[in-house]
Amino acid sequence: MGLSVVTLRLFLIAMTIAFVGCAARYAASPGSTTIAPGLQFAMPTGRELGYSIETAQLITAHVRDQVQVFQAYVSVTPDKITIIALDPFGGRALTVTATDDAIHTDVAPIVPAVLRPGNILADLAIVYWPASAVRRGLAGTSARLYDDKRERTITDNGREVVHVSYQGPHENTWTNVAHLRNIAYGYELDLRSTVTTK
């Protein structure tokens, strides 16, 4: 079995059970991340989602031989995207805040290095943002997005690197159930959302 990230996706994640309370690390990053070796994805803004939303997510992450389940809170407004992920004991494991200017992260030591905050944000955008925003994020690369009512696929030079499947139609709505598989980096995310405010 494997482990899945998120959101953000996002994304996401082999978290260890013991939270030792070590100091968190803080970083700011530019507005793009690598979603497959050599493939940059420019982060869409909250504005590009087309609506504001607050949602609680149950994320099951499969990475290599590990499976981890965690809860996340996601808030998207035109000016800011916030993702807060909690460890199994309810402690804050990860916070990602993205504005038009930068991505800021606060990551607890229990979060493995394979879980990069930029990828959590990219996974969230690939799953939930409109196809036009995802295509803009891939502009200038050789990658292509294929999108229909129940799935999305990103290919790069003819090979599939990311695949998303949905329980139902997903365009212009925050779907309740989605599954993201990053073939290039070898992880999968099962995403179950409960929208609290829209």
Residue ranges and their predicted role:
Residues 64-99:
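Extracytoplasmic beta-rich ectodomain segments of secreted or membrane-anchored proteins
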Residues 18-21:
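C-terminal motif of bacterial Sec signal peptides marking the signal peptidase cleavage site
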